[in-house]
Curated annotation (Swiss-Prot):
Keywords noted in UniProt: G-protein coupled receptor, Glycoprotein, Membrane, Receptor, Sensory transduction, Taste, Transducer, Transmembrane, Transmembrane helix
Compartments it resides in: Membrane
GO molecular function, one term: G protein-coupled receptor activity
Signal peptide: none
Topological domains annotated Cytoplasmic: 29-40, 110-128, 205-234, 286-318
Membrane topology (UniProt): Multi-pass membrane protein
Designated gene of the protein: TAS2R60
Any GO BP annotation: sensory perception of bitter taste
Protein's name according to its UniProt entry: Taste receptor type 2 member 60
């Protein structure tokens, strides 16, 4: 899902790679449609009613950032496919990279704040800090949203500075993308500036996300065991609700993990972009990205209500 993974100067002609690229495009379309529906459904309700649950506001933020991110990645994929010999730091690709850096950071931070909200509101820990956070967290929602924009903007500017300096070096020295000197300048900047910056900016929200998810899954697991001991089994509504919540959280965590690993692998060059394994890995990640919005649609009460109303309106029932 990394927008920087395309290596220019070569066109993909292998049949297997073309098939996987086609699958990737289809999965991206599914992810775009799913996140677009989530954003539109909750966003319209937010605008019309002027009220929305804090959790749903975070879902709007996450859905919008994912929708825009997938659209930018698809646009870059199409551009690179149509212009395989394009200069890597031309204005078009710099503009797409600028958008990708911002939306990628916004997606990471939106996911992180959503995990924080889930952890504080759902976890059943009895520590006084948790009780204090439960009462304060909803009031901090605007700051969460603004911090996502602020942190994303700050890191995007830092990435843009590095990319723009490489672009200026190429122009100043009249270098070509495939020139040895140009490659050494690019690798030096990647190794000592961009790669450390990527690891810092990506690891910070990921660490918070993991801590919150571990706490939340542990709390729900303990609560489920207690519910099983005091009820007749898995058919009890309370037990089923906890199982559904666990499955939704696990799918959310799996998507976030795969997304983070794709960023790290791409930045470290573990899977070369023209390698077949790279496209297989990307297909698995986008499969998770396409499935997760569907899980959200059926696990969120408001989204389920929107789906039911759409079905009833199509069937002509009141």
């Amino acid at each position: 899902m990394n927008g920087d993974h395309m290596v220019l100067g070569s066109s993909v002609t292998d049949k297997k790679a073309i098939i996987l690229v086609t699958i990737l495009l289809l999965l991206r379309l599914v992810a775009i449609a799913g996140n677009g529906f989530i954003t539109a459904a909750l966003g319209v309700e937010w605008v019309l009613r002027r009220m929305l649950l804090p959790c749903d506001k975070l879902l709007v933020s996450l859905g919008a950032s994912r929708f825009c991110l997938q659209s930018v990645v698809m646009g870059k994929t199409i551009y690179v496919f149509l212009h395989p010999m394009a200069f890597p730091y031309n204005p078009v690709l710099q503009f797409l990279a600028f958008q990708w850096d911002f939306l990628n950071a916004a997606t990471l931070w939106s996911s992180t704040w959503l995990s924080v909200f889930y952890c504080v509101k759902i976890a059943t820990f009895t520590h006084p800090v948790f009780f204090w956070l439960k009462h304060k967290l909803s009031g901090w929602l605007p700051w969460m949203l603004f911090s996502s924009v602020g942190l994303s903007s700050f890191t995007t500017i830092l990435f843009f500075i590095g990319n723009h300096r490489m672009y200026q070096n190429y122009l100043r020295n009249h270098l070509q993308p495939w020139n040895v000197t140009g490659d050494s300048i690019r690798s030096y900047c990647e190794k000592f500036y961009l790669f450390p910056l990527k690891m810092i900016t990506w690891t910070m929200p990921t660490a918070v996300f993991f801590i919150c998810m571990i706490l939340l899954i542990t709390s729900l697991g303990r609560h489920r065991k207690k519910a099983l001991l005091t009820t007749s089994g898995f058919r009890e509504p309370s037990v089923q609700a906890h199982i559904k919540a666990l499955l939704a959280l696990l799918s959310f965590a799996m998507l976030f993990i795969s997304y983070f690993l794709s960023l790290v692998f791409s930045a470290a060059g573990i899977f070369p972009p023209l390698d077949f394994k790279f496209w297989v890995w990307e297909s698995v990640i986008y499969l998770c990205a396409a499935v997760h919005p569907i899980i959200l649609l059926f696990s969120n009460c408001r989204l389920r209500a929107v789906l039911k109303s759409r079905r009833s309106s199509r069937c002509g029932t009141p």
